[in-house]
Each structure stands twice: as structure tokens, then as C-alpha cells.
UniProtKB/Swiss-Prot annotation:
PROSITE patterns: ABC_TRANSPORTER_1 (PS00211), ABC_TRANSPORTER_2 (PS50893), METN (PS51264). Residues 2-241 form the ABC transporter domain. InterPro entries: AAA+_ATPase, ABC_transporter-like_ATP-bd, ABC_transporter-like_CS, ACT-like_dom_sf, MetN_ABC, MetN_ABC_transporter-like, NIL_domain, P-loop_NTPase. The complex is composed of two ATP-binding proteins (MetN), two transmembrane proteins (MetI) and a solute-binding protein (MetQ). The lineage of its organism: Bacteria, Bacillati, Bacillota, Bacilli, Bacillales. The gene is metN1. Its EC number is 7.4.2.11. Keywords: Amino-acid transport, ATP-binding, Cell membrane, Membrane, Nucleotide-binding, Translocase, Transport. This is Methionine import ATP-binding protein MetN 1. CDD domains: ABC_MetN_methionine_transporter.
């Protein structure tokens, strides 16, 4: 649905070149809720501007719904832009217009009939739960209600793609959760492909099925949300995951436990999915290695509607200890693991 092929984007200011994007490649599939996460300045919003053709790539290709728009003119982009909706962090509503007129604006600009406008706007306001607010003005609404108006406005043209640029950053946690639920409903009800730009890993965890992690203009990690949460490969991905899920004991706890440890030991970090939780993992490990297994840490969380568990296990070592058998067990059971000592 959206594809970036070795895309780079540079800006030139006062004899200085700023590389906003460097050789970015990834694909957003049809019906995805695809998250792009990174800190400020990572290049996330530049990607959105390329999809909207507000900026042109310096190098590479940008493919939208099968069209290579890299070198499209504004005129050539008109029909494609009709299939792209957009919501922003600060809503971008007209304060002098009612909720109804704000939602209707794209249809008014497209010169649709009054009958069609009334029908379509009424449908969208009902969908976002604001039918009773149609005659109110933005200043009379809460932040969450304003974002619902913005979502209705983005949907009123029946787009194929919805771009969300930090759409929940200005909202409190409870309101954020309700907006994410609404966006998931948008995806499921209308089959709209959603590209989420965010710096909040909780947004990725709660709504996205796939994610790209960006740092300094580059995509440093991509994968399913489960893959990235279960085994983040890069330091920045590990840092983002740790903001919403504690996946291992604190360094201070490890130091205290190590100080009390007698003899050599080996530690494992494992990631257990919901479908694996009925297996007697600890009991199996005790039988395999013939010794006690210490659980130094355990935490559970929910990712994409599935419960997952992170555990840190410790085995005392001696000459009879067979780490190969433990590794083989994890592989046979498809349990993701990492030796950490």
C-alpha cells in the first residue's frame, strides 16, 4: 500500500545540508496499522510529508497504492490525495466553524451536493460518537472530542490510507486509549490502512501490528510488534520497549543477587507467549538439568490482545551442567531465549 525504496531526503539551509532521511526502505501492507516510532528529529514526520507529496524525495522511490509518486506533479497527485486522510497532533480544526462544517469541509471543497454532504457527515459523526455535537464549535469540545472531529473529517472522503502524525501526543492516557480504540475500529470496519507516527511505544503496543524504529533519519529495526517487543535488537528499540514493559530485573537487583550467589551460574532471559503458558516449562527444565531453577524476575503484559511473559532464570553451574540441553529444549518448544551470563 505504501512503500519506501531506499529513500533519502536532504534539506539545504544556509550552506548547510541536513539529512532528514537516509536510505529508508520498508513497506506498509494493505490493512496494516503500521507504526513508525522514534525520538524528535528522527525523520518520522518527513515520511508523512513524502506520502502526501508535500515534499519530494532527494533519492529513492515512494510508492503509494501502486503509483510511484516520486516525481509526480501536484496535478498528478490530486486523485491520489483523495485516497489519503490525515490527522494531526493539534487537530487543525476551524474554530469559527461548527463540528458539522469542519467534517464537511473536504466535501465542500470537492463541490459535492448538499444531500451527499449531509448524509456522509451524519454517518461519520455517528461513527465517531459525536452526533449530538454537530452544532457546537471546537472551543466547546474536549481534546478527545476535537480529535474525533478530526478523524471524522479525515474519513468523510472514504480514503484508503489514514496518516496519523502524533495523533495522541496532546491527549491524556484515558483519552489516548479511547482514540486508539476508535482508530482500530476504523481499520477493522473500513479496511483502511493506517500509518501511525509516534514517539510513544504504548501506542505501538496497543494498536499496531507492525513497526519501524527510526533513529537519526534511518530505519534501524523493523518487524511485527510481537517480534520487536519479544527480542528488540537495537539499543533504541530496547529503550522504547522498556518504557512500557519491564522485561528484566533492575541492574541494582542483579548486583545484589550476584553478591549473594555462591559458585558459578548461568542466566537466561526467556519470552513466553500465551499459547506456551500451559506448558510446565520450569518443571521440564528441572528434570533436564537435574537441579533447581531460580526465577529471578517475571513480568506479564498484553500485546495485540495476547498475554506474554518475560522471565529471567538462573541455574547453578558445576561440571555436570549441560547448557546445550537447555538451549535445545527452548528451541524445540519455540521459546525465545537469550543467554545473559
Amino acid at each position: 500500500m505504501i512503500e519506501f525504496r531506499q529513500v533519502s531526503k536532504s534539506f539545504h539551509k544556509k550552506k548547510q545540508t541536513i539529512d532528514a532521511l537516509k536510505d529508508v526502505s520498508f513497506t506498509v501492507n494493505r490493512n496494516d496499522i503500521f507504526g513508525v516510532i522514534g525520538y524528535s528529529g528522527a525523520g518520522k514526520s518527513t515520511l508523512v510529508r513524502l506520502v502526501n507529496h508535500l515534499e519530494a524525495a532527494s533519492n529513492g522511490q515512494v510508492i503509494v497504492d501502486g503509483h510511484d509518486i516520486t516525481n509526480y506533479s501536484d496535478k498528478m497527485m490530486r486523485d491520489i490525495k483523495k485516497d489519503i486522510g490525515m490527522i494531526f497532533q493539534h487537530f487543525n480544526l476551524l474554530n469559527s466553524a461548527t463540528v458539522f462544517k469542519n467534517v464537511a469541509m473536504p466535501l465542500i471543497l470537492s463541490k459535492k451536493s448538499k444531500t451527499e454532504i449531509k448524509q456522509r457527515v451524519t454517518e461519520m459523526l455517528e461513527f465517531v460518537g459525536l452526533s449530538d455535537k454537530k452544532d457546537q464549535f471546537p472551543d466547546e469540545l474536549s481534546g478527545g472530542q476535537k480529535q474525533r472531529v478530526a478523524i471524522a473529517r479525515a474519513l468523510v472522503t472514504n480514503p484508503k490510507i489514514l496518516l496519523c502524525d502524533e495523533a495522541t501526543s496532546a491527549l491524556d492516557p484515558a483519552t489516548t486509549a479511547s482514540i486508539l480504540t476508535l482508530l482500530k475500529n476504523v481499520n477493522q470496519t473500513f479496511g483502511i490502512t493506517i500509518m501511525m507516527i509516534t514517539h510513544e511505544m504504548r501506542v505501538i503496543k496497543d494498536i499496531c501490528n507492525r513497526v519501524a524504529v527510526m533513529e537519526k533519519g534511518q530505519v534501524v529495526e523493523t518487524g511485527t510488534v510481537k517480534e520487536v517487543f519479544s527480542h528488540p535488537k537495537t539499543t533504541i528499540a530496547q529503550n522504547f520497549v522498556s518504557t512500557v514493559i519491564q522485561t528484566e530485573p533492575s541492574p541494582s537487583l542483579i548486583r545484589r543477587l550476584n553478591d549473594k550467589q555462591v559458585g558459578d551460574f548461568k542466566d537466561y532471559k526467556i519470552f513466553v507467549e500465551e499459547t506456551q503458558m500451559t506448558q510446565p516449562i520450569i518443571n521440564d527444565l528441572i528434570q533436564i538439568c537435574g537441579r533447581e531453577v531460580k526465577i529471578l524476575f517475571s513480568s506479564m503484559s498484553e500485546i495485540q490482545g495476547n498475554t506474554v511473559c518475560y522471565m529471567w532464570l538462573r541455574f547453578n553451574m558445576d561440571q555436570q551442567f549441560d547448557g546445550t540441553a537447555i538451549n535445545q529444549y527452548f528451541k524445540e518448544k519455540n521459546i525465545q531465549f537469550e543467554e545473559v551470563h
